[in-house]
Design a protein with these regions (language model features):
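Short, charged juxtamembrane terminal tails flanking transmembrane helices
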Residues: 1-6, 169-173
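Hydrophobic transmembrane alpha-helices
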Residues: 2-58, 64-65
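Residue-level signature of transmembrane alpha-helical entry/exit and packing/kink sites
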Residues: 10-22, 47-51, 66, 88, ...
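Structural signal for membrane-spanning alpha-helices in multi-pass inner-membrane proteins
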Residues: 25, 29, 58, 77-81, ...
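Membrane-embedded alpha-helical hairpins and interfacial helices in multi-pass inner-membrane proteins
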Residues: 33-44, 86-90, 105-173
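Membrane-helix interface "capping/anchor" motifs
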Residues: 56-70, 107-113
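Central hydrophobic cores of alpha-helical transmembrane segments
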Residues: 65-76, 114-124
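Helix-adjacent hinge/juxtasegments
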Residues: 67-104
Length: 173
């Protein structure tokens, strides 16, 4: 097989995987929000559906493709469904970018370990909090209270991400 043919197949494969990732980033949150749930906090904050597709894609998609999907997915989701809200959109995008880059780095270096997605999520939220605080000039310890609450709420989603990553790590070996 010629190099040009291999490159074409790679580009097509990456494009299809990227599109599938973006579609999953739109439809997984929609499915989660269709589940009847009463509470002041959206079910997505508990289950983290927006982070499932990038985790899976990190095993199949190039880092640049994953970054593009992490930008486009939430934007399309917002414009099609209104979720995440305009206020939360930049925060979600930053978190997804940091999360995707960390998970992709670990997967690419063949150092995937159980708990990497949970750790990447925690670090992504922490980095996002610091970046937003630095950009707005409101960098204080008070910023970390909502972060801690958000992490507590996200525990079921972190468990879901960990179960998915265990499956993916076993499958990739």
């Amino acid at each position: 097989m010629t190099t040009i043919t291999q490159n074409k197949k790679y580009i097509i494969s990456q494009s299809l995987t990227g599109v599938a990732t973006i579609i999953a980033m739109i439809f997984l949150p929609i499915l989660v929000h269709l589940v009847p749930f009463s509470g002041s906090i959206p079910l997505g904050a508990y289950l983290l559906p927006m982070f499932i597709a990038p985790l899976v894609a990190a095993f199949y998609l190039s880092p640049i493709g994953l970054v593009i999907a992490s930008l486009v997915g939430p934007l399309l989701n917002h414009y099609l469904t209104g979720m995440p809200t305009q206020v939360m959109l930049p925060h979600i995008i930053l978190e997804l970018l940091f999360f995707s880059l960390m998970v992709s780095y670990v997967v690419r270096n063949k150092s995937g370990f159980v708990g990497m997605s949970a750790l990447a999520f925690v670090l992504a939220k922490l980095i996002r909090t610091i970046v937003v605080g630095a950009l707005t000039g409101v960098l204080s310890l008070d910023m970390f209270t909502p972060l801690a609450m958000g992490l507590k709420i996200a525990l079921p989603g972190l468990l879901i991400l960990t179960v998915i990553e265990i499956f993916l790590i076993r499958r990739s070996r």
